[in-house]
Amino acid sequence: MDKGKENRAQGVLKRISGPVVTAVGLDAHMYDVVKVGNEELMGEVIKIQGENIIIQVYEDTAGIRPGESVGNTGLSLAVELGPGLLTSIYDGIQRPLEVLVDKMGNFIERGVSAPGLSHEKKWEFVPTVKKGDEVKAGDILGTVQETNIVHKVMVPPKAKGGKIKKISGGSFTVDETVCVLEDGTEIAMLQRWPVRVPRPVTQKLNPDIPLITGQRILDGLFPIAKGGTAAIPGPFGSGKTVTQQQLAKWSDAEIVVYIGCGERGNEMTEVLTEFPELEDPKTGKPLMERTVLIANTSNMPVAAREASVYTGITIAEYFRDMGYDVSLMADSTSRWAEAMREISSRLEEMPGEEGYPAYLAARLSEFYERAGRVISLNGEGGSVSVIGAVSPPGGDFSEPVTQNTLRIVKVFWALDAKLSQRRHFPAINWLNSYSLYLDALNEWYDKEVSPEWNPLRAWAMGVLQKEAELQEIVQLVGSDALPDEEQVTIEVARMIREIFLQQNAYDAVDTFCPMSKQYDMMKAIKHYADLARTAQTGGATPQQVIGIRSKNELPQIKFIRDYEPELAKIMKDMEAEFDAMRAV
């Protein structure tokens, strides 16, 4: 929090109801940060009703009592932005967990504050502008080599700008002045920004470049654009967290912000232990060097879940303003919505559907609308892609959080418990999922992958839909009762499912599949389907066509890094088998 002049107007606690407390005699504005009780717990003003100031407390309120003092800081909830964010692990209100561990061991005590960034560490600042240059809000003044990522030091968005009077390179802490403008404005590497306010941009752009994730079902059938929004709803155990972690590991965003919002502590532990060991495929450095983690597990106070979501998106916007592509994972937005429901009921507000507050949709859209591909104030192009997991109770997609999320996001990756029970992973149901970015991304796929890619994708989806229609008949009378052509369609659909859609997140090669390989795999399956149709026209039986041995080698391609020679051999053998069939 800001350590400037704190307007510590004193009030008194009147009522305590879990994380929601009421104070009287306090001079406060909406969203002011306050210190509650003798232990000075951190809270935020969420409602003002006459004399009553209603506060949500970001720490456990057990043991505080009416009559204790409440102090107003006069500041809104803000995050510290500057060098040192990357590789950090924060709680929901940007307290670095590593610093808290040093202060008090593994269990966080109440009323302890720690700055989001180290104010002692020195960073090597290299100016990119010189004395006499004119700068405006958002302009880049210089760079700091933070990790492998270059951190760009910018003029704060609310600054007036002007001519540079003095700027110097060298080692500085985040608090020290690196640039002085002619009007006397001093600029340090540290910025503070209120989390509920979106950072300003010059222009929003149409999202027309895909965020490549290396997951075949996502890149191939339901792509998300850079600056896009996606939801991953699914019942428990269907693979939401693993899918989120795969996206955090392999998506081609330059910065990843991962928010563990009210999820199990074990899952956050997995992320915290895995990420430092994983290698970024593009740089060969640890993945953690491009990651900011916000750990806010389910046993932490519920009010901090809301703060963690806003903290994460504000950090993501900061890196976007530098010109980076950022992907933000929120796991899970349902836990945040449940926190809203709990606080709303404590405020005795009129409940909406299933007890959620009437403003649920507004809060969700407020969050997702901060995604986008933009031109920032300094002319750099950057993006924030938001991927939110949703955990509907019992896998019921008709519940309010899922339905309101679907109204806002443009990509829907529907996880299916039945698929996960059949050990089909990622368990994304190809019939229920959709992407509204397909038309916008077609041109990119034509140019960067192949002009054949879009027709190939449409063909694959057509085969999978045809299989779903035939499945009822197959379950009643068996596949042998189908016409010859449709028996082969069932086999081709099985190949698409098992060879293309299934992917092993724990295999060193198959965990990430580049677009070129996805295209070659899909083309190989289509080539088999074309050869099979030609053979059937020539009188071959479905049993002969399905019995082609070389096609059984195709699944092995997934696990071979330099797959091209092996794939070429399989295709050659396949053509030879079909030629031999025709000769008979």
From Swiss-Prot:
Compartments reported by the entry: Cell membrane
One annotated GO molecular function: proton-transporting ATPase activity, rotational mechanism
Keyword Hydrolase assigned: no
A biological process term (GO) from this entry: proton motive force-driven plasma membrane ATP synthesis
One GO CC annotation: plasma membrane
Swiss-Prot/TrEMBL keywords: ATP synthesis, ATP-binding, Cell membrane, Hydrogen ion transport, Ion transport, Membrane, Nucleotide-binding, Translocase, Transport
Disulfide bonds: none
Recorded topology in the membrane: Peripheral membrane protein
Enzyme class at the top of the EC tree: translocase
Binding-site residues, ATP: 234-241
Any single Pfam family the record assigns to this protein: ATP-synt_ab
UniProt keyword Membrane present: yes
Catalysed reactions, semicolon-separated: ATP + H2O + 4 H(+)(in) = ADP + phosphate + 5 H(+)(out)
Signal peptide: none
Domain of life: Archaea
Enzyme nomenclature, EC number: 7.1.2.2
PANTHER family listed in its UniProt record: H(+)-TRANSPORTING TWO-SECTOR ATPASE (PTHR43607:SF1), V-TYPE PROTON ATPASE CATALYTIC SUBUNIT A (PTHR43607)
Name the record gives this protein: A-type ATP synthase subunit A
Organism encoding this protein: Methanoculleus marisnigri (strain ATCC 35101 / DSM 1498 / JR1)
